Amino acid sequence: MQKSKDIGFKISNMDLHIDPFDDFYNYACGTWIKRSKIPKDSPIISSFYELRDNTYEKLKLILLSCIKEPSKFKNGKLLADFYQSYIDMKTRNRLNFSPIKYIIEMIDALKDKDELPKLIAFLMLNAVNTFIRFDPSPDEKNSSVYALHIHQGGLSLPEKSYYIEDLLKKVRLSFRENIIKMFRLYGFSIAEAQRAADTVIRIETKIAMISRSKGELRDVLKNYNKMSTDKFRKRFAYLHLDELLNDIVPKLPDYLIVGQPEFLSGLGKIIEEENIDDIKLYLKWHVLRSTANLLHEKAANTLFLFFGRQLTGQKKMKPMWYRATNFIINTIGNALSELYVEKYFDKSAKAKAVKLVNNIRKAFRERLSRVSWMSQSTKDKALEKFDAMGVKIGYPAEFKDYSSIKSSKNDLFGNYIKAYQFELKRVMGRISKKVDKKEWPTEAFTVNAYYNASMNEIVLPAGIFQPPFFDPNLDDAINYGGIGSIIGHELTHGFDDQGSKYDKYGNVREWWATNDREKFNEKAKDVEKLYSSLEVLPGIRVNGKLTLGENIADLGGHTYCL
């Protein structure tokens, strides 16, 4: 092969000494793999992570401009206040744990378990999620309306396997040490902190035992249980639904969607078994865990020792500016999105992106129409769904109005709670209302893309339209290999093991002929088996059931862009 100069995707990352027919992976990126090292402040290195870090640099420049001339930019003062309050470690250290004193006092005031639902609601209003998780999102079987979903929660570790598998025993021991350190920082004696840690782990292990695994949570049908509000009140009386939701939602909905009913039943038994003082310790831990990164330096560093270093392998924390930027992304990110689009997104490139999307859609449709194992009736419905699939590119037509948030450059925790409650009020206020099809659930600078099943659409934010994934000045072949494979990946999600359960309107219903669904499941099982056979580390294999949707999308994405 004739050697070429580096272009957008950097040929120097390839290993041209390898025959692509023997080892395409190393041919494509072998040299990059050999010379790349995971940064000490990152758990991973990849094109996505490198581009994300570059994007954060751009966001930092925007924020520094807001600090210098806040009146020059929309939401300039708000962004400047949030950034400055985060990096002001002198004030944070002086305040110590005082910003969360009012939350801890509310926990200490708990006298009876019947008061627990109201306390859970108070904690949620103050950005502390505990036993259960609320999600106001489109009803999976009536995607035109927002419904209130209730899901399992209550765990500090990523999922239930961390509490029960022998392989992860060392992780649990480190987790216990981290809880002890955090309670010691808060002022507990060694004995008190040890008892608190043992209590937290005991309660969370009980919760893990009644929780579904990540693999089980992927199945949309098994995690959809529509229940009238009256039935919920009777079945889960211990939650005192009215007290639980009165301060969170403007009006109780007629029905709820309960993701895991057996979890709520089991949780009631756990709460009944545990004494009130131990429940208080559990709740205090979740306050400390949820707020440590917004408090003093020692609290943030202590949390990182386990949740950063131990769980992810990240050796050191990101620099302060990076963490401050991330804080803004997670609170008032839409304000930053608007300025990012103005400064960095080449709107003229959007036309080329649309053309590229249309060409990949054409290839996808042609291939779908030729599927030999699918009956014509199912194929016709699949094509209808594909033709109805929407595409959002770049950024939303409108951005959020943050004018009601009164910020201060000296009050990090106050800024956080105001932003959190602003968003909570916004999303909870839409329950039972019509879904806003124009809404973007991600920020414009996000270096990613996704398929939204309930909207039957793919979303391609402005942030993904950067080298090495996309460059409007380069040959189309390079862009098809970059952003093209990502677009194909997201289109395929509409027909993977879960996406295929949604119809063209974004509603979960069985639109496949029975025989076709059985054939699809057989083929999906083959993909699951293939990936489950891959050994990542000695004795550790890929969980093909958990990764199935992504594996199907990867295979489809590369096929269609080629």
Kindly label every feature range from the protein language model.
Residues 27-41, 180-192, 388-390, 468, ...:
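Short amphipathic alpha-helical segments with coiled-coil-like heptad repeat character
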Residues 11-12, 16-20:
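A charge-rich, low-complexity, intrinsically flexible signal that marks solvent-exposed coils, linkers
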Residues 19-21, 126-129, 141-144, 273, ...:
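Short, well-ordered loop/turn elements at secondary-structure boundaries
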